[in-house]
């Protein structure tokens, strides 16, 4: 299993939001995410909830046919920031 993403989208994230998939891939690989949720608006998609720079981010993803995690986008989430209060991860092991 690998974590993959679209490089064009990654460049756009770096330009527009000052973040990158690499940052969140590292958080995910090290199991430092807060939660994994079903995406209520997309039936085959899940969301990693992560903290970065003291703010809560949503990282929607899918699993491809080879069980790779395909990151779709990253965005700051007021909804999850209110819900989780900006807390950092708890060990997932």
PLM regions and their residue ranges:
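Ribonuclease/tRNase effector modules and their secretory precursors
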Residues: 1-93
